[in-house]
């Protein structure tokens, strides 16, 4: 397994936690999904959530963003309990960017119109809105495809578009749900390099969930392995391989 990420973080002891889950449990129709889950995403860290499909990885993201509410436990972002804030305010209050596994864009709109539509919602100042759109076009090298309807983009281009849309509100935290699913090997390599560069350039914290160890462990600082509703292991990629 080729390690793309040269581990910048030598010690996690002095890092500032940006997201903290404390003994979080969640059930759906009396079926346990998460059982007393606790972990920290540190500022400037790329953290992986690893486990088979159905183990609760996406549920964790839905709890953080407010789409779901835990049965027990607390979710702390920037020293604030997110459960005290309305769902509609969480993305802006806590500067969260979320990239879903599927969709996340307007299929029939062109790439540039996707950027404009989301920027219109999130950014009130016209000049700031124009600047951030131009930044995304440059950063993701969209120049040659800005007028193509999103539904005609390749899998990798669609994923880059959704990441760009998630970055429009200048988030502190980026959540990526199964970003490598259904992509070819070369596109996965490109996307992993993009994620690592994003963290380095934008200084944001990133949490990625995936079910493939070979994809996830090559681009994270640390990872958590989930099984049977619980965390069964934590560590750096070299410790977990």
Identify the role of each PLM range.
Residues 50-52:
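The feature captures the beta-strand-to-loop junction immediately N-terminal to the Walker
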Residues 65:
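Helix-to-loop junction immediately C-terminal to a conserved catalytic motif
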Residues 73-82, 91-93:
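Conserved ABC transporter NBD signature motif
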Residues 128-145, 196:
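Conserved ABC ATPase "signature" region
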Residues 149-153:
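Conserved ABC ATPase signature
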Residues 174-178:
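Catalytic Walker B motif of ABC-type/P-loop ATPase nucleotide-binding domains
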Residues 210-211:
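H-loop/switch region of ABC-family ATPase nucleotide-binding domains
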